[in-house]
Amino acid sequence: MGDCNISTSDNKQNRKNHEIRVPRVRVIGSDGEMIGVLSRDEALAMAEKEGLDLVEIQPQADPPVCKVMNFGKFKFEQQKKANEAKKKTKQVEIKELKFRPVTDEGDYQIKLRNMRRFLEEGDKVKINIRFRGREMSHQELGRQMAARIEMDLGDDVVIESRPRLEGRQMVMMVAPRKKS
């Protein structure tokens, strides 16, 4: 039968040796070869003869599947796989960029470049357009700024939330478009 898949989906702790309480188990040898259905005592004696542990790897099967292996090494490999999987997942951050309705062209271009970089890295960007003093009476300038940002970013972004007014600032959220 060759290699077997070891699943520990619902069972955090694998039972080993004398913790296994079922009378008959399906045994896989230390070399990965299927040995067959044996009594628990026979399987334990076989594991002890090889100086290894009998580990229950599929308790929900009928009869449960056990493998003769080094339990310490097995746990170490499991931990290593879990750490690798954890490393590969990227936490999405929310970056925030602040604009004003009268943001100068040079500053606008720099912020736009930074925004594109954040989006390429897979982060979401929260855009704040702050109004000061009498600028509140010219909210259309903020809407124009938001529309310009949306136009300049093009099709490589998803607008998660349209520009909305929160107190004295207009807030908009953009995220990178998923590449398929």
Curated annotation (Swiss-Prot):
Sorted UniProt keywords: Cytoplasm, Initiation factor, Protein biosynthesis
InterPro entries: T_IF-3_C_sf, T_IF-3_N_sf, Translation_initiation_fac3_CS, Translation_initiation_fac_3, Translation_initiation_fac_3_C, Translation_initiation_fac_3_N
Chief location: cytoplasm
GO molecular function: ribosome binding; translation initiation factor activity
GO annotation, cellular component aspect: cytosol; membrane
UniProt key word Membrane: no
Subcellular location(s) of the protein: Cytoplasm
Gene Ontology BP annotations: ribosome disassembly
Keyword Protein biosynthesis carried by entry: yes
Protein family membership: Belongs to the IF-3 family.
Subunit structure and binding partners: Monomer.
Role summary: IF-3 binds to the 30S ribosomal subunit and shifts the equilibrium between 70S ribosomes and their 50S and 30S subunits in favor of the free subunits, thus enhancing the availability of 30S subunits on which protein synthesis initiation begins.
NCBIfam families per the UniProt record, alphabetical: infC (TIGR00168)
Protein name (database record): Translation initiation factor IF-3
Protein's organism: Xylella fastidiosa (strain Temecula1 / ATCC 700964)
Upper classification of the organism: Bacteria, Pseudomonadati, Pseudomonadota, Gammaproteobacteria, Lysobacterales
